[in-house]
Amino acid sequence: MMKLFIIYLPAQCSPGRLKNISKKAISAACRKRNDIEAEYITAADEFCFLAGKGSLRKAKILFIAEIDEGGINLEACKILSYLQSHASSKPLTGSAGAIVIDGRGDMFTKDLGRRIAFAANIAGLSFPGKPLVEASEDLHNFRVLADLWDTDLYSAYEKSVLLLTDKLLDFEAASIKNTSSYGKQKILAVHAGNKTTSNSFNLWEMIRKNMEDKADIEDISIRNGQLIDCRGCKYDDCLHFGENAGCFYGGVMVEKVYPAIIDCDALVLICPNYNDSVSANIMAFINRLTAVFRAHDFSQKKVFAVIVSGYSGGDIVAQQIIGAINMNKNLILPADFAMIETAGKPGDIFKIRDIKEKAAKFAANITGL
């Protein structure tokens, strides 16, 4: 029997919209299956108690939250605090999750969604691609889907929550699918750092050494201005090029990156922290994925990240990658998807305590071995 936990966190003055939509979607999804046992959790204290007992492991977890006009849900904040402070005990190990956020304006829904995803991920939770449904107060963010499905905004919201619930119940956070003809996993690592001075690249080298006999690894460098950023072609033009694994602007993205990412089982982004963001080249790489993403299914690929900050903010960079690659580009977010370290001066990465052991552990997480 599969256990589904619905973490339902209404706002203090709830309009009731999310309650009606989520209950209808969950009931419909569960009726399709005869092996689901659903349980509602409506308070942070109850969530923390069950997590502490290990009851939230090897389950499906659907976070459903309303935010107030200030973008806050106090019960959600308590859960975030618990997950972040108990990450080392992995209270959500073996579980998979999805998120629905209902807002009182046009802002803050994605912010809370990404924060929940990151906190749950470091606590052991995996997410399928596109695991977030968010609703602005006027539901105008559902205009495109409403047109596509020939329906109204409310019905588009309702259908999105149902599809997300179905996706969660069907999702299995299994090890990376092997596509190599000789059985090894195909891993694509993308970086833009200087190999001699970059702490993030040196950390990746430590990780890589632990996987060389277990995976087929391809490294692609996109430094020194090789990559032109996305210029925002019309949708039809972008789709046309993407269907042919191309892009109007060509270059290393078309020649090397597109074929490699279509072929890989897992993507590893090596990301030094630049002003609490990925570097310009990595951001251009993410933007240019749009063409190939529109024509190819990334839902069976996983994303991992190696993040090194000189001062702080690695968690912010991790959330940026979650938003861009998992929530937007549809790649799976495996549990503990990011290795996050702080190393300021060149070579400082080697001075971190137990860094080789950490690198070996992260390599095992990537390969699933």
Per-range role (PLM):
Residues 206-207, 218-225:
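Redox- and metal-dependent alpha/beta enzyme cores, enriched for Fe-S-associated oxidoreductases
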